[in-house]
A protein has these predicted regions:
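Sec-dependent N-terminal signal peptides
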Residues: 4-13
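Terminal presequence/propeptide segments associated with secretion/organelle targeting
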Residues: 2, 16-720
């Protein structure tokens, strides 16, 4: 009786998932979620959402570029995603003469669609629970360190072996991905098909796609048209292929119908996408560690980098275009780190985590299992032991690896060894390879003088953050040869290195010298940074292995407790395809303040500030607003919708995700979360967490009325 009472108590406490909480595995929907989704308003069968044996909505959702989500919206391979997901490719095609970032881009014919070098979109063909098979392979394997259960190389071999057994064919375009879930208590195999000829079709100007920019980022209310459009191309027989002028638009097996009827408070929605990372199974000590290391370093270091980049980008158009994507990428998680730390304190997440820990420990005691308590104590001890190493590693990563671009100078070891070996054939091959690597380093988006200015600030900041006796070994040179003056060291790098300019590299390669390579300051700096980062990893290796084992046991405990209580479960995000659901809704961020669930074009006009580049409104958009020329995209009361908020459980990687209504029709595109919900990566809060979405009516309004690209709408299935 005592055991039953305890389980009943645990079921009522805060580990219970809220109706809106969860990044659910598609394979679990029918068993775990279908009834709840239908109670909340889902108006189609769960098999229309996902079914392994039939074509369904899953088949119209793509992993876009490996870091975002996209959705197929026409039978000829049109893919809709966010403007910020396509931003790097818009920037790739931009120049001072063709400034697509500022002016936007619209292909009025198929011939005008622009190939995007390096862009892939990936469909998920099959999702297989291979837990039992992997566990059998683990038992057979020789694993003296006991780490194969998380080893990517080992799991890749297991995936290949399983595919051979099941006769799953793979090639350059159809690949396997086997990943651990729930701390490696379960394993799933994903069979994926990637298309590598993807072309840019349309993007609004940044004054629409990035309206509000950094000021509004991670905020609600929002007023940006954060979308861009691409097209998948394939060979003439419909197979994935590398870029070729002979390729044709892909005839897809599934595309999503678009609904223009709009949204209202309380409407059921669901989202499919590829959420990147979250950490819902952390204990409180890990949350504190995250606040004091990763988030602290992002806030401190990126803030300095962004200030310098902003100053340089304001000076001329060329620099602005060169650094637009880098700036946006850095700023995104700079603000995220600030908001997360503020929210973790404001919402008392540490207290909540401590209560949840006590529930699980009590559950373990109630069933006579002390493994969960041992795992908890082990994690606490490990987090304390590794604190300084994590702190230092994050400083190296943020300041020196991400912050200083000259860290990425090409590897010169092959040439140095060839020179020492004195074999001309080896030397010629190494010279040719370094020449090619140099071309990639000196790409059109690299500005050495900007890098010099940023590097001076960040290397000095690293020195202030890390005690002298712990710094990476290049600081011995800085102390000895530059009297500790980091600015002088950076100047010497940019004045003397063979990588100071393309011309300097070419001149060196005419008569390469091993000693000069060995003494080159940029080369030595890059090696020191790499070695310093690796040293922090090596210093934590024992703790990392012990942590992984303890975390696996801890998560197993959570699963067992939820199973005992009949509660649904979901794993942490790991860039695999998931589904989340919730209702459209307003919310109250603070006493006396309410944010409505929607925004309109009126709000864009109210925010306009011609003196602030983040809030410039295009003249054509103002003209359409003043004339109320909204076409069929207006709300019933005549206003033009822009964005809406829904209580789905999103995180980074969900950017570009399709937002479906109860009938599985597209009503919007997810692009962000609200500031009050940034703690959601660690702890979900149903009252405050919202996903910001571009209303599909605004997307089509911009395509049709603003851009005049109505030919694209003719490809789409639109329900009016």
């Amino acid at each position: 009786m005592k055991h039953k009472l305890l389980l009943s108590l645990f079921a009522t406490l805060s580990l219970t998932a809220h109706a809106d909480e969860g990044m659910w595995m598609l394979t679990d929907l029918k068993q775990q979620n279908a009834a709840v989704m239908q109670d909340l308003g889902l108006d189609i069968s769960i098999d229309q959402v996902y079914c392994p044996d039939n074509i369904n909505l899953k088949d119209a959702v793509v992993h876009f570029g490996g870091g975002c989500t996209g959705e197929v919206i026409s039978s000829e391979g049109l893919v809709l995603t966010n403007h910020h997901c396509g931003y790097g490719y818009i920037q790739q095609h931009s120049s001072v003469e063709h400034d697509y970032l500022t002016d936007g881009f619209w292909a009025m014919t198929r011939e005008q669609e622009l190939p995007c070098k390096g862009l892939n979109v990936t469909f998920i063909d099959r999702i297989l629970d291979v837990t039992e098979y992997v566990q059998k392979q683990l038992k057979k394997s020789k694993d003296p360190d006991g780490t194969n259960y998380l080893s990517p190389s080992f799991l890749a071999k297991v995936a290949e072996k399983f595919a051979k057994k099941e006769r799953i064919r793979t090639n350059e375009f159809t690949t396997l991905e086997l990943k651990p879930f729930y701390g490696a208590n379960k394993y799933y195999l994903f069979v994926k098909t990637s298309y590598k000829d993807v072309r840019m079709v349309g993007a609004p100007p940044s004054s629409i796609g990035k309206f509000g920019a950094d000021t509004d980022n991670w905020m609600w209310p929002r007023h940006c048209g954060d979308f861009s459009i691409f097209r998948i191309y394939a060979s003439k027989d419909g197979k994935p292929a590398n870029y070729s002028a002979e390729n044709v638009p892909l005839k897809v097996k599934k595309h999503i119908a678009i609904n223009l009827k709009g949204v209202k408070e309380g409407d059921f929605t669901f989202v499919m996408g590829f959420p990147g990372r979250n950490w819902r199974y952390m204990i409180s000590d890990e949350v504190e560690e995250r606040m004091q290391t990763t988030n602290f370093m992002r806030d401190t270091i990126r803030g300095v980098r962004l200030r310098v980049l902003g100053e340089e980008m304001a000076k001329d158009a060329r620099t602005r275009i060169q650094y637009a994507a880098k700036y946006a990428s850095s700023a995104n998680y700079w603000k995220n780190a600030i908001g997360m730390n503020e929210g973790l304190v404001r919402l008392k997440v540490l207290d909540r985590k401590k209560r949840e820990q006590e529930q699980l420990l009590a559950f373990g005691d109630s069933i006579g299992n002390d493994n969960y308590r041992k795992a908890y104590e082990s994690i606490k001890q490990i987090v304390a032991q590794r604190h300084d190493a994590v702190y230092h590693q994050q400083a190296i990563y943020e300041a020196l690896m991400l912050g200083t671009e000259f860290f990425k100078v090409p590897d010169t070891d092959a040439l140095r060894m060839a020179l020492e070996g004195q074999k001309q054939k080896d030397i010629d091959e190494a010279v040719a390879a370094l020449k090619e690597a140099g071309k990639k380093f000196f790409n059109k988006d690299y500005n050495p003088e900007v890098d010099r200015k940023v590097s001076k600030q960040l290397i000095a900041l690293y020195a202030r953050l890390i005690p002298a006796d712990q710094r990476i070994d290049i600081f011995q040179t800085i102390e000895k040869d530059f009297q500790g003056n980091t600015d002088a060291f950076v100047d010497a790098c940019f004045n003397q290195s063979i990588f100071r300019s393309p011309e300097a590299l070419d001149e060196f390669l005419k008569q390469p010298d091993a000693q000069q390579l060995e003494n080159d300051l940029m080369v030595r700096y890059a090696a020191s940074v790499r070695n310093g980062y690796q040293a922090t990893s090596d210093a934590m290796q024992e703790e990392t292995n012990a942590y992984n084992a303890a975390h696996k046991t801890w998560v197993e405990g959570v699963l067992q407790m939820k199973k005992a209580n009949g509660q649904p479960i979901y794993p942490d995000a790991n860039s695999t395809l998931r589904l989340t659901y919730g209702k459209i809704g307003s919310y109250e961020p603070a006493d006396g303040k309410e944010y409505l669930y929607y925004t309109t074009l009126k709000g864009v006009m109210e925010k306009e500030d011609p003196n602030n580049p983040e809030f410039v409104v295009p003249a054509k958009l103002k003209e359409l607003y003043e004339k109320k020329d909204f076409g069929p995209y207006a709300m019933p009361d005549g206003r033009m919708p822009v964005c809406f908020a829904t209580a789905t459980d999103n995180t980074g990687g969900n950017s570009g995700s399709p937002v479906f209504n109860a009938k599985g029709e597209l009503i919007g595109t997810g692009f962000d979360r609200n500031y009050e919900g940034l703690t959601g990566d660690i702890a979900y809060n149903p009252q405050l967490q919202r996903a910001a979405c571009v209303d599909i009516r605004y997307t089509l309004f911009i395509i049709d009325k603003f851009a005049g690209a109505s030919h694209l709408l003719k490809e789409m299935t639109i329900i009016r």
